[in-house]
Regions:
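Single conserved hydrophobic/aromatic residue that forms the stacking wall/gate
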Residues: 1-11
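Acyltransferase
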Residues: 9, 13, 117-120
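Hydrophobic residues at beta-strand termini and immediately following loops
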Residues: 14, 82, 124-126, 136, ...
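Catalytic beta-strand/loop cores that center a nucleophilic Ser/Cys/Thr
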Residues: 99-142
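A glycine-centered loop/beta-turn motif at secondary-structure junctions
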Residues: 135-175
C-alpha cells in the first residue's frame, strides 16, 4: 500500500468531518479516498461540499472501493445496490488500458453503473464476472479509482502498481 512506498507526511481522517482547507493549506501532494462501509450516496451527500473543494483544486486523487464510488458520484455517475455483492478474493478484473487481467480482492455491495456514465470519465477496469465498472479515471484532472482492494492483492501482487501510479501522478503534478 501507500505506507510501504515510503511516503512522508500523511493526513488521516477516520470520519466524514474533514475540512478541505486542512488538506489544501498543508500542500499535500495527493488525496487518497479509502474504503469504508455504507451507501455511497449517503456518504457522498455528507462530504459533498468539502470533497468538491478538493476536487476543484485538482489535487492528485486515488480512490478505492467506497472511495471509487464516491468519486464517481462526484462526477455525476450513478451507483446502485447490487443484488449480490462482490465478497472475497480471486475476482478477475480486466485492465482495459493494458488488456491484462488482475486477480483482486473485493468487498462491496454497491456498484458504479454503466448507464449514463459521464463523458468526463473513462472506464479503465471491468469485472470479468459481471462486467461491472471496477475502475475509472478523469479525463481532465489527475484522478483515478478502483472498486477493489489493491492493498490486499490476493494474486501475485497484481494490483499494487496502482500505488506506484498514484505516486507518479503526484510527482508529475508537483513538477
Amino acid at each position: 500500500g501507500i505506507a510501504s512506498r515510503g511516503l512522508g507526511d500523511v493526513y488521516k481522517r477516520q470520519d466524514m468531518n474533514f475540512k478541505a482547507e486542512d488538506i489544501i493549506n498543508k500542500n499535500f501532494d495527493g488525496f487518497f479516498l479509502s474504503n469504508g462501509p455504507g451507501d455511497p450516496k449517503k456518504v457522498y451527500e455528507n462530504i459533498k461540499p468539502e470533497l468538491n473543494k478538493l476536487l476543484n483544486k485538482k489535487i492528485p486523487t486515488f480512490g478505492i472501493c467506497l472511495g471509487h464510488q464516491i468519486l464517481s458520484l462526484a462526477f455525476n455517475a450513478s451507483t446502485a445496490r447490487m443484488e449480490k455483492g462482490h465478497r472475497g478474493g480471486n475476482h478477475p478484473v480486466k485492465n482495459l488500458e493494458t488488456n491484462k487481467v488482475e486477480i483482486t480482492s473485493q468487498n462491496h455491495g454497491f456498484v458504479v453503473l454503466d448507464e449514463n456514465f459521464p463523458s468526463n470519465l473513462q472506464i479503465t477496469h471491468k469485472s470479468l464476472f459481471d462486467k461491472t465498472i471496477d475502475g475509472m479515471k478523469a479525463n481532465d484532472q489527475p484522478l483515478f479509482s478502483v472498486q477493489y482492494h489493491p492493498e490486499s492483492s490476493p494474486g501475485p501482487h497484481d494490483s499494487r502498481y496502482l500505488f506506484d501510479e498514484f505516486i507518479n501522478l503526484m510527482e508529475k503534478n508537483a513538477g
